[in-house]
Amino acid sequence: MNTKELIASELASIIDSLDQEAILKLLETPKNSEMGDIAFPAFSLAKVERKAPQMIAAELAEKMNSQAFEKVVATGPYVNFFLDKSTISAQVLQAVTTEKEHYADQNIGKQENVVIDMSSPNIAKPFSIGHLRSTVIGDSLSHIFQKIGYQTVKVNHLGDWGKQFGMLIVAYKKWGDEEAVKAHPIDELLKLYVRINAEAENDPSLDEEAREWFRKLENGDEEALALWQWFRDESLVEFNRLYNELKVEFDSYNGEAFYNDKMDAVVDILSEKGLLLESEGAQVVNLEKYGIEHPALIKKSDGATLYITRDLAAALYRKNEYQFAKSIYVVGQEQSAHFKQLKAVLQEMGYDWSDDITHVPFGLVTKEGKKLSTRKGNVILLEPTVAEAVSRAKVQIEAKNPELENKDQVAHAVGVGAIKFYDLKTDRTNGYDFDLEAMVSFEGETGPYVQYAYARIQSILRKADFKPETAGNYSLNDTESWEIIKLIQDFPRIINRAADNFEPSIIAKFAISLAQSFNKYYAHTRILDESPERDSRLALSYATAVVLKEALRLLGVEAPEKM
């Protein structure tokens, strides 16, 4: 039980009109620590108690009694709690030194499944920085949900079907070179894709030709299928190399094509339930009662099925296959209307589990303020970007620690971690401007800054040859260590908030705060000097390292022992 829960529990025992959960939501952290560690505002009780909030606060303060509090005072309408530093620090250090990386593990999920639809790049197109957001947010959410007791299923819903394959087949047949594609598949296919789009703007017949080839593909034409399979296989080899670089794994690569034979069943169910209406020759589902103006277009007038039909088939398949408790789609915010339609159609079909589906949108990555576009060839490709980040990290590591043995390995962890961390520290729904120099900096709110704080602590622990005792009698009561203790104690709640809001940035910001607090402590405290507090200071350093490493792991970022 953390201190906020303890305070809420104590207050609930003497307040009749509010339960523990309601009290917990009202608790605040005073901006000035001189006003206490936690405050309870008594305003909400004034109406029920028919007393002034100041009087209520004074009465509550008088009744509070626990050894976890140094003192409890009423200041105006607030009850201010000053926690007993020695007691709380002893509890926190005991918990972390005993539980180690399992500190803050929870069993909220009871091993139920969370399906995460993430990454999902388009076949035959390069893996750009735009795809990175879905990949790293999804991967981090997977770690976060596992930490609180869920099992996760990471699905890479590949964009491996659609008219773009008609375009690619036409381009390849006109200008393609088999050897060049084999040597550099994505580069060559991108050149072909950009070229056919540029030429189609002046020559509409190319569009018609592409549609014709896609029709052939849908009808199982041998040549079209062979080219499609080849484009898919070559792209996947390249994608998997990048996923290995990012240390991201998937449980399923079932993409759009996987659902080709599963969509008719969806149309049949909609038809049987009387949900399909005809509109200008097309078949649609009316969703006005859900406040959605545009109907869901299920089948076009030429009989072709649409994106939503495929996603309905995927949702039904995943529910049947994984019996999920939650199904999360980590997809850009421009798809918000689509996912509202998807949930509404599933609701119309009578599936209560549509409530368990969540669209987790995210903002755009720009370069110098400009939007990125594959079609126009204006992209930041991930592979050369990772190589550049690793190279920049290595230069800084060589300057800081020329004797370091495994420089390349550490530079890779720092370079890749820098890109991931920068993305994840940004509030998910905000975009950000891609700035490699800022990402790889060891100063400021960056991944390398947090990694370096962790490596510095490991260096201190090695010098002291410190091994924590699970029954160690550790406790501290100074102001600098108290800031760190409060953060470490808050870690379980931070993880819950990140899960509840599908927001890894909560953990990234926490990691920055913890690293900053420790660096401040390190600057003011002679940790290694002989003193009665030496072991407790080392235990605090150890606990900080454990929590920093775990916070980074939840973001999919490595924590090198030396830097």
Curated annotation (Swiss-Prot):
Its EC number is 6.1.1.19. Pfam families: Arg_tRNA_synt_N, DALR_1, tRNA-synt_1d. One of its GO terms (molecular function) is ATP binding. The keyword Magnesium does not apply. A motif ('HIGH' region) lies at residues 121-131. It comes from the Bacteria. GO terms for cellular component: cytoplasm. PANTHER family: ARGININE--TRNA LIGASE, CYTOPLASMIC, ARGINYL-TRNA SYNTHETASE. Monomer. NCBIfam families: argS. Belongs to the class-I aminoacyl-tRNA synthetase family. This is Arginine--tRNA ligase. The lineage of its organism: Bacteria, Bacillati, Bacillota, Bacilli, Lactobacillales. The gene is argS.
